[in-house]
Amino acid sequence: MKKTLRKETIAAMKELPQSVKIQADEELTQHLLELPAFQEAKTLATYLSFDHEVSTAGLIQAALQLGKRVCVPRTYPQGRMEFVEYDPDILEKTRFGLLEPNEKGKLVDQSEIDLIHVPGVVFQSKGYRIGYGGGYYDRYLEDFTGKTVSTIYSIQQKEFQPDTFDQAVQEVLVYEVTL
């Protein structure tokens, strides 16, 4: 079921008109920047978005301009992930077509991260999410004590039964897509 929901939702996200996506991305980024959790955070962990996802470029730029420390994920086999300080000069394309920092990046300890901006494909009403199937964020969030937030399009909202290992996102910001 998760596989089908993931596939259908990604297809719908890719169908969003560019004009709608640009508007949605700007509004969601602005909303996130206004959150107390963001304003109070010294260190923000986010991700380098795929084209069909809510763009993180504006968020990263704004956070850096505000003097925040920004980190992005580096993944390893068996679903292990760690965050590395954002530096555009050390980004490399992975086998999944995703940009990630290389080994030269400075690791950021989980205890130093105040807010994690969590990616995902499908979200249900209690904040549980379906990602891309690697379990990276569910494993990482298991012991994370800071705040979590996601930014999504309304077409990503669907009800499903979470698994016992799934970790809920504390706050999900939604842009209501009208086509």
Located regions from the model:
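A residue-level signal for conserved active-site and pocket-lining positions in enzyme catalytic cores
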Residues: 9, 46, 70, 117, ...
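Charged helix-capping and loop-helix junction motifs
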Residues: 61, 130-136
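Anionic-ligand binding patches
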Residues: 84, 118, 122-124
